[in-house]
Amino acid sequence: MTLVELQSLAKRLGMPGFAAKQIASWLYDKKVASIDEMTNLSLKYRELLKQNYEVGAEAPVDEMRSVDGTVKYLYKVGENHFVESVYIPDDDRATLCVSSQVGCKMNCKFCMTGKQGYKANLTASQIINQIHSLPERDKLTNVVMMGMGEPLDNLDEVLQALEIMTADYGYAWSPKRITLFTVGLRKGLKRFIEESDCHLAISLHSPLAVQRSELMPAEKGYSITEMVELLKNYDFSKQRRLSFEYIVFKGLNDSQVYAKELLKLLRGLDCRINLIRFHDIPGVDLEGADMDTMTRFRDYLTTHGLFTTIRSSRGEDIFAACGMLSTAKQEENNKS
């Protein structure tokens, strides 16, 4: 719950106004598991809370561990649905990849979540629970909203979750610790930029509209050229980072022709490109470019003034890498 929601709750139960901040502190700072632990609230108010609410933290129901240290957690949400989140430890940081929906409507050709189809939006509480219930939460340094689902398609709940992560009453994290990944939706992109200070990453994957629409049907609703024109109205030259994600497919978008088109498309934007290796998924006739090709592509862009990195791949052996999250099997098993 946000502070405004907690204030409304306190008022409804006849609690003093300051109780909302006390409850928030217990939930997000002290991370209690039960209302009984909120000892600076009177017994009367704790009983009132218990009659109407519960902390609601749900532990993961399953986990898978990669040889590279990545951990994929499975959460049950509601009666019949599941989502996955991915914990990625590194030498100097630990990142959690968080989901915003059960499945996804975007149906990107290269993504298993999209193949699963859309099932439900997560509430802000269900998004926050992936952090709150993370066994390694005390080691966490960064959050990326790039798990299952399209965050801008569930923007009200996502913005509430981001508020809890960044507000003084919540986790009090710097927005610079959080990145939202999106295909770019007309109805939500501008609002996110203006209502949040978190980093932004756009799924690009092709600078050409026709090809991008074949890979990502969302291009038909809001073209990448329109998106770039919108982004030029905002300042990304300081601490807030704008990046474009680009899966490099063998023989499809990996030539110098595409590198030149990227330079043309993104000219005038303060941004970076993250190149991503494609991870094979069942039933998809795409193949990833080899590392030599990706390195040449990166070097060409970098020498022409566009800062470009090759993102390391983690958790592929447990289907936790980019584009590989899916709970279709668990959803089907839960029906039977």
Pin down the residues of each PLM region.
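Generic beta-strand structural signal
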Residues: 71, 83, 94-98, 106, ...
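P-loop NTP-binding catalytic core
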Residues: 79-88, 92-93
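Canonical Radical SAM [4Fe-4S] cluster-binding loop centered on the CxxxCxxC motif
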Residues: 89-126
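Conserved AdoMet/S-adenosylmethionine-binding subsite of the radical SAM
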Residues: 135-142, 147-311
